[in-house]
Every structure is written in structure tokens, then in C-alpha cells.
A protein has these predicted regions:
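Residues lining the SAM
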Residues: 124-126, 155
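Conserved class I S-adenosyl-L-methionine
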Residues: 1-52, 65, 151-163
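Class I SAM-dependent methyltransferase SAM/SAH-binding core
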Residues: 55-111
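A short acidic, Gly/Pro-enriched loop at the edge of an enzyme's catalytic core
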Residues: 113-122
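A short glycine-rich, Lys/Arg-flanked "PGG" loop and its adjoining helix->strand segment in the class I
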Residues: 136-151
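A short His-aromatic
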Residues: 130-131
Length: 163
């Protein structure tokens, strides 16, 4: 896709519309999360291992549940998302739960201009990469942020799930 600006704008509006709906849904189970339940499943936890003290960049963090679950595991977390409403909710959750986390609202393609750090780990999960018009460019963003020997941890659904 040569000009993704309208695509990005529409995508942002869509995700802004979904934030409060998602936060109120049983799928995200905010009550359990607020009481300390991790949103990370067995597969993700096995892939992550011990992340205590590691710097983690969570791309497409939505409203920060997984980011804050990573923080509960001892990681130093930065979450990035296109939706300004999601980032606002992530910041509110971090404050409410007294958890450390930095949240940046940005077009992920532009993240290297806004986040001046390298990370031990880049994490993204479920329904994230299907929204990008240029996966090669997205992969370049991931590579940009990884320290030498850093890892990308990615868990996602097969696209057929949504058909």
C-alpha cells in the first residue's frame, strides 16, 4: 500500500471506538485483572520466561492489560499503540494499580521517532499484525528496537479464525 495515511486514520478511529466496549466486555475481565489476575496465558508465559528486570516494548498494547501484566512480572515496560483513547486508559490503569509503565500513543511505523530506547524483548499478541498495510516495515520497527540478542515474542491467531 503506497499511501497508508487514510488507512492509519481509519484504523485509529476504529480502535478508539473499541476501547470502552472492550474494557466492559467479559473477554477482558477487568474485575479479575484489577484484583491481580494476569492476562497472559500459558503459551505467552512459557515464551516469555523470567522477564524480571528486562526492558520490554509492548507493541500494539491496546489499553495496557498485557503491558501491566508484564510489569507485574518485574519487567520495565513501555507500551505503544495507535489509539490515543487506549493509551489514556492504559495510563489510568497503571496509576490505579500503582504499577510502573510508560505508554506512548503513536503510529507504530513512527515509533522509532518517539521512543529512544533499545529493548531486551519486543512483545505483541493476538490480532495485531493483520492491521498493518506493510509487514516488512513493521518488522523493521521491531528490529530497530531490539538490543543485540534481543527477542521478538509474538502470539497471534491464524487469520482464518476471523473469517
Amino acid at each position: 500500500m503506497k499511501d497508508a495515511s487514510n488507512y492509519i486514520k481509519l484504523n485509529k478511529a476504529t480502535w478508539n471506538d473499541k476501547v470502552d466496549v472492550h474494557m466492559a466486555s467479559s473477554f477482558y475481565d477487568m474485575e479479575a485483572f484489577l484484583q491481580g489476575k494476569s492476562t497472559l496465558n500459558e503459551i505467552e508465559l512459557a515464551l516469555l520466561g523470567d522477564i524480571s528486570g528486562k526492558k520490554v516494548l509492548h507493541l500494539q498494547c491496546h489499553f495496557g492489560q498485557d503491558s501491566l501484566s508484564l510489569a507485574r512480572m518485574g519487567a520495565q515496560v513501555t507500551g505503544a499503540d495507535l489509539s490515543d483513547k487506549a493509551i489514556q486508559r492504559a495510563q489510568e490503569l497503571a496509576e490505579k494499580l500503582n504499577l510502573e509503565g510508560t505508554f506512548v500513543c503513536c503510529d507504530i511505523y513512527e515509533a522509532p521517532k518517539l521512543i529512544d530506547e533499545k529493548f531486551d524483548l519486543v512483545f505483541t499478541s493476538y490480532g495485531t499484525i493483520g492491521w498493518f498495510p506493510d509487514l516488512e516495515r513493521w518488522a523493521g520497527v521491531v528490529a530497530h528496537f531490539l538490543k543485540p540478542n534481543g527477542q521478538l515474542i509474538m502470539a497471534d491467531f491464524h487469520p482464518v479464525v476471523w473469517m
